[in-house]
A protein has these predicted regions:
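A short glycine/serine-rich beta->alpha loop
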Residues: 13-16, 60-66, 80-90, 116, ...
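Extended, low-charge hydrophobic alpha-helical regions
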Residues: 20, 67-69, 370-540
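Residue-level signature of catalytic and energy-coupling elements of molecular machines
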Residues: 38, 88, 112, 172, ...
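Short hydrophobic alpha-helical segments that form membrane-spanning helices or hydrophobic packing faces
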Residues: 45-48, 94-98, 322, 415-420, ...
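A helix-coil-helix interface module used to build multimeric assemblies
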Residues: 48-82, 89, 102-104
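Hydrophobic, well-structured modules enriched for small/aliphatic residues and gly/pro motifs
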Residues: 85, 89-92, 107, 111-125, ...
Length: 540
């Protein structure tokens, strides 16, 4: 008892065993999605706990569905999610690269090299990698549509959507251009909030399009309301158009019949006042995030021959998008409504039936800063994969518009950076030069994986690529992901945004450093014995 500081079921691992375990866990995760890189990527079919099927080759989507036990493996899955949230692309590359960074560190740990020395070399290598990326990057004219389409095509080409790449590229670029907002010299592109993807099963993928406006899965609240309005005046509310219900502790004492009639009259007067506030502005269309009472419906339809079309219980996010699309302002109280709060930017409002459901369209907006991407397809699984691919494509567009610098794809950048690091390692002295040089070796995993996924000869093609990069002006030479041959990426038009590549390198190296610093894992916790619990109950 004296010699045991931990509880009996607490397990502690330390030293070399932990570091080897972490490296093996990271390598295993990297091996799972290694075949998902490049245009010849294989797809994975995953069964989720509810029995649903996920078919994808998106690194983040695969790892999100996998249940892991090892803490290092959990860290690897987390970096894929971070990459997806930060830049939206490169989720597979970052895992493969992080796994390789740890794999090359294993030999130095076996040679009794201290992890701090390896980490110091990795940090220095990361700084040099980022400097090299800036040196070899080329600026891009974001107003050149054909160039932008080429960049998006490079991102989509590795996905299931590659068959419809032209359509997908145009959809992604149009959507991002629509939500682009420039205020006081600063660009803001919020895809998550203002570019909504609506998946409607049925039809074919070629029917998909970008709507210059908003589409929501709602119908009008009364059959007599208009279902098509040209140039509508739109009012957006964030308040209920029903009589205000009392709180849970509200009591009303009624002593005679007239009191009850008076209460009902007060309710009606309150709703009458709300309706008058709205009707005063002569809107055609009313959206509210809360409910609408029956009395209010009748007022909207009857008074002064008005026929206001009302749609209730609209989501907050949808209301925000409608506001951006038509220029309206969301108001929290009807008595605060002013003429400038009315949106007049929309050209057409209509309700359409697609399949079994009704959808409301607000389109032909003059200057929409929000849009809806309508996706059609054979099944829910296909639509889910198409949406994932489109999100990646839109993120690539966003990255290029915010940071207009490009790098050649197809492993060309990795080979160029690897060559620079190898040259710089010769100037280093001491033990640090070996881990520094190992980073250069690790970078070659990207072109090597591309070659493997094509089924080409890895040794022959990689040796030729190394030889090619020793020549001048060979930065753009990489692996053609379709055939596995050497090609000039600039000629093929395969480009990657600088923001994605820089984030991939930062995340991969930082993760390798994080896992190398771990030398102790303490797992388990004290479980209460049943006797203790029973004793505790008895004592009470």
């Amino acid at each position: 008892m004296k010699g045991r500081p931990f509880y009996q079921n607490v397990k502690r691992e330390s030293g070399r065993k932990v570091q080897t375990g972490n490296i093996n866990a990271a390598k295993t995760i990297a091996d799972v999605i290694r075949t998902c890189l490049g245009p010849r990527a294989m797809m994975k079919m995953l069964l989720d706990p509810t029995g649903g099927i996920v078919m994808t080759n998106d690194g983040n989507a695969i790892l999100r569905e996998i249940q892991v036990q090892h803490p290092a493996a959990k860290s690897m899955i987390e970096i894929s999610r971070t990459q997806d949230e930060e830049v939206g692309d490169g989720t597979t590359s970052v895992i493969i690269l992080a796994g390789e960074m740890l794999a090359v560190a294993e030999q130095f740990l076996e040679q009794q090299m201290h992890p701090t020395v390896i980490i110091s070399a990795y940090r220095r290598a990361l700084e040099d990698m980022l400097d090299t990326l800036k040196e070899i990057s080329t600026p891009v004219d974001t107003s050149d549509r054909s160039m932008m389409l080429k960049i998006v095509h490079s991102a989509i080409n590795t996905k299931a959507l590659s068959r419809w790449s032209e359509l997908a590229c145009n959809i992604a670029l149009d959507a991002v251009r629509t939500v682009e907002l420039e205020e006081s010299g600063r660009k803001e592109i919020d895809i998550k909030k203002y570019a909504k993807v609506e998946k409607v099963p049925g039809g074919i993928i070629e029917d998909s399009c970008v709507l210059r406006g908003v589409m929501i899965n709602k119908d009008v609240t009364h059959p007599r309301m208009r279902r098509m309005i040209k140039n509508p005046r739109i009012v957006l509310l964030d308040c209920s158009l029903e009589y205000k219900k009392g709180e849970s502790q509200t009591d009303i004492e009624i002593s005679k019949e007239e009191d009850f009639a008076r209460i009902l009259q007060m309710e009606e007067e309150y709703i009458q006042q709300i309706c008058e506030d709205i009707i005063r502005l002569k809107p055609d269309l009313l959206f509210t995030e809360k409910g609408i009472s029956g009395t209010c419906h009748l007022q909207c339809l009857k008074q002064n021959n008005t026929n206001i079309t009302a749609i209730r219980r609209v989501r907050k996010t949808d209301n925000n998008r409608i506001a951006r699309a038509c220029g309206a302002r969301i108001v929290s109280r009807t008595d605060e409504l002013r003429e400038e709060d009315v949106g007049v930017g929309a050209g057409l409002f209509e309700v359409k039936k697609i399949g079994d459901e009704y959808f409301t369209f607000i389109t032909e907006c003059k200057d929409p800063k929000a849009c809806t991407i309508l996706l059609r397809g054979a099944s829910k699984e296909i639509l889910a994969e198409v949406e994932r691919n489109l999100q990646d494509a839109m993120q690539v567009c966003r990255n290029v518009l915010l940071d207009p610098f490009l790098l050649p794809g197809g492993g060309a950048v990795e080979m160029a950076v690897s060559k620079h690091l190898t040259e710089r390692s010769r100037a280093l002295t001491g033990v640090e030069q070996w881990p520094y040089r190992a980073v250069a070796q690790a970078l070659e995993v990207i072109p090597r994986t591309l070659i493997q996924n094509c089924g080409a000869s890895t040794i022959r093609v990689l040796t030729s690529l190394r030889a090619k990069h020793t020549q001048d002006n060979s930065v753009c030479w990489g692996v053609d992901g379709e055939s596995g041959c050497l090609s000039d990426m600039a000629a093929l038009g395969i480009w990657e945004p600088l923001a994605v590549k820089a984030q991939t390198y930062k995340t991969a190296v930082e993760t390798a450093i994080l896992l190398l610093r771990i030398d102790d894992i303490v797992s388990g916790h004290k479980k209460k014995d049943k006797e203790e619990q029973m004793g505790g109950q008895g004592a009470e």
